[in-house]
Amino acid sequence: MKFLNLIIKYRLLLGAIFLVFGIIVNLEAGFWPSFVLYLIAAILIIGHFLFGPMRLIQGYMEEGDMEGAQKVIDSIWFPGLLIKPVRSVYFTLKGNLAMANQDFETAEAHMKKSLSLGMPMKEAEGANKLQLGMLAMQKGNMREAENYIRQAIRAGLPDKENEAAAYLQLCSIMINKREFRAAKEYFRKVKKLKPTTPQIADQVKQMEKYISRMPG
């Protein structure tokens, strides 16, 4: 994995080196002896612009190194050249970084751009819509938040932690609408999923105190 990450990190540089060697061999011995070098150079350079360093960005984000992730994403000079599914992931990652920096307007714009391009997997679409729902809640737009979160659940979410977060947000929205029976039903779904993420688990504890005093 580390070797693959190194290849991805230095893919453009390696492509340029192979291209230079290819030109030298071509001048010294002709085209066919240099063909393999040209081919490797083409694969590396084209791969850099079509697929980008998404694997590196995700690695940094999983480690919590947002600064490292930002540096890598800023190194993508021509995002328009990325193939469509990769470009969608690119805008999702930009949205995640903007959210981490509390720049919610920019995050929303990037997430919507990602959705408009089409997500490579249904679970990714669900996670994207869940984040848009949470952004709408940040702005106090409960109707839009509910709409996005319901769409996220229908599309499918990558794991039980995301599912629990979605149902917890719906529970909060129902409380805000004073639909207490629906709120309790969504809270039961959250409890059934048994989330372990500290932030979600803490929210569940806080919500449980409120739910126990709720009518309906």
Q: Each predicted region: which residue ranges?
A:
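Transmembrane alpha-helices and immediately adjacent membrane-cytoplasm interface residues
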Residues: 36-63
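Short coil/turn linker motifs that delimit alpha-helical repeat modules in TPR/alpha-solenoid proteins
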Residues: 45, 82-86, 120-122, 158-161, ...
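Amphipathic alpha-helical segments of tetratricopeptide repeats
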Residues: 74-78, 112-118, 150-156, 189-193
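Terminal, low-structured helical/coil segments at or just beyond the last alpha-helical repeat
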Residues: 3, 183-216
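"A position-specific structural signal for the A-helix of alpha-solenoid helical repeats
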Residues: 55, 86, 92-93, 124-134, ...
